[in-house]
Amino acid sequence: MTAWLGFLAVFLCSWSLRDLVAEACTCVPIHPQDAFCNSDIVIRAKVVGKKLMKDGPFGTMRYTVKQMKMYRGFQIMPHVQYIYTEASESLCGVKLEVNKYQYLITGRVYEGKVYTGLCNWYEKWDRLTLSQRKGLNHRYHLGCGCKIRPCYYLPCFATSKNECIWTDMLSNFGHSGHQAKHYACIQRVEGYCSWYRGWAPPDKTIINATDP
């Protein structure tokens, strides 16, 4: 009887742990510009290899990458060879395919290693919009002093001059919404931040902060 109760306790603990892990990865929607500005490293790279590292209870996946271009992180790590992520998607680990695609990868540096996850911005390069690519090259950097405030229900108003109101959540698009795909929040000379879209330099075409 005692042995059976012991087995039941272990089973229930294992089941609870499994449920906890399955529900562990929850990410708050973030605009690509904020994802860029909050990252230590932003690169365009192709995955050329992977290896499961036996560290931690669930392991860590180490991806070997061929860096094509760096957009952020020159002073921290000018060349990235490895990207680390949790081996399990339930722990926010990302799954990248080897020798197939070029990816945009953002991440943070910890003890000399670049870590990324589902809550970081990563995407197949050919799925990025032209505006997002231009943002990576210079526009997002120009807006790192701005604050992008999500709007979950109307009305929404900017509470300071450096805010842009992000309304993609009103239609549940979030990261893949129209503003996320096509707009950057740029700071002007006067210190005001506004949404910007277009092919002219940011100081020539500025739109209203609440009207993307």
From Swiss-Prot:
It is found in: Secreted, Extracellular space, Extracellular matrix. Keywords: Disulfide bond, Extracellular matrix, Metal-binding, Metalloenzyme inhibitor, Metalloprotease inhibitor, Protease inhibitor, Secreted, Signal, Zinc. The keyword Iron does not apply. One of its GO terms (cellular component) is extracellular space. Residues 25-28, 89-90 are annotated as: Involved in metalloproteinase-binding. Its main location: secreted. SMART domains: NTR (SM00206). InterPro entries: Netrin_domain, TIMP, TIMP-like_OB-fold, TIMP_C, TIMP_CS. This is Metalloproteinase inhibitor 3. Complexes with metalloproteinases (such as collagenases) and irreversibly inactivates them by binding to their catalytic zinc cofactor. May form part of a tissue-specific acute response to remodeling stimuli. GO terms for biological process: negative regulation of membrane protein ectodomain proteolysis; response to cytokine; response to hormone. Zn(2+) binds at C25. GO terms for molecular function: metalloendopeptidase inhibitor activity; zinc ion binding. Residues 1-24 form the signal peptide. The record marks N38 as: Involved in metalloproteinase-binding. The keyword Signal applies. Belongs to the protease inhibitor I35 (TIMP) family. The gene is TIMP3. Residues 25-144 form the NTR domain. Pfam families: TIMP. Disulfide bonds join C25-C92, C27-C119, C37-C144, C146-C193, C151-C156, C164-C185.
